[in-house]
């Protein structure tokens, strides 16, 4: 049986893109030094989570993978350290805008792109203003260390996401996430959120990160 060590990065994000990327790099290096082989960064870590307000100027934050500074930096870092890094970013593809993840293999190459399927829309998650529902479908990738599936944040509430990736042969499931509970409810939703993830892990007999 193969053993794979994974890490999940949690960090405070500011409005300074360069500062956020530098902080992410520092934490990836620390995780790699501790032996992690697959290192998950948070959802949309380049900026503060901007989806709580509708601002047309925020559309300018979207880029292609080739133009995205975080994707480029993490490609170089993955190749240097020999680690796999799923990188969340705001993607522009033609006239469409997506909440996406570039799965970067340990040689720095991009295995592929996943675009978030389930897009929330309420007072504090105005994501439908910013993102088109993804058109990639759920996917898995053979990386240097494991066959992995990647969803994004709100996808975690839906069991079919995890099940589809499990049936495609995923060995590990990753869900980069910006928010883990509802900020405006009187009752903390974090335990419900965590129980959903535990359910995905138990039902599909694999770790969920």
Which residues are covered by each model-predicted region?
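Beta-strand-turn-beta hairpins that frame and shape the catalytic cleft
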Residues: 1-6, 140-149, 172
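Short polar catalytic/cofactor-binding loops
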Residues: 10-15
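Short glycine/proline- and charge-enriched loop/turn segments
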Residues: 52-61, 122-123, 183
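Catalytic-core segment of enzymes that process non-peptidic bonds
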Residues: 60-150, 202-209
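CN hydrolase (nitrilase-like) catalytic-core segments centered on the catalytic cysteine
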Residues: 63-84, 153-209
């Amino acid at each position: 049986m193969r053993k794979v060590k994974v890490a999940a990065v949690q960090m405070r994000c500011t409005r300074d893109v360069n500062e956020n990327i530098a902080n992410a790099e520092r934490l990836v290096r620390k995780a790699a030094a501790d032996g992690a082989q697959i290192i998950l960064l948070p959802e949309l870590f380049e900026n503060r989570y901007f989806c709580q307000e509708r601002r047309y100027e925020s559309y300018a934050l979207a880029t292609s993978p080739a133009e995205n500074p975080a994707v480029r930096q993490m490609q170089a870092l993955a190749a240097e350290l020999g680690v796999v890094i799923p990188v969340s970013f705001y993607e522009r593809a033609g006239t469409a805008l997506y909440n996406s993840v570039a799965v970067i293999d340990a040689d720095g190459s991009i295995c592929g792109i996943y675009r978030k399927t389930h897009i929330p829309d309420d007072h504090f998650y105005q994501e439908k203003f910013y993102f088109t529902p993804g058109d990639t479908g759920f996917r898995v990738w053979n990386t240097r260390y494991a066959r992995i599936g990647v969803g994004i944040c709100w996808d975690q509430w839906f069991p079919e996401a995890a099940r589809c990736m499990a049936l495609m042969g995923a060995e590990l499931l990753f869900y980069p996430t910006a928010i883990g509970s509802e900020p405006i409810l009187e009752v903390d939703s974090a335990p419900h959120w965590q129980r959903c993830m535990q359910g995905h892990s138990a039902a599909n007999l694999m770790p969920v990160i």
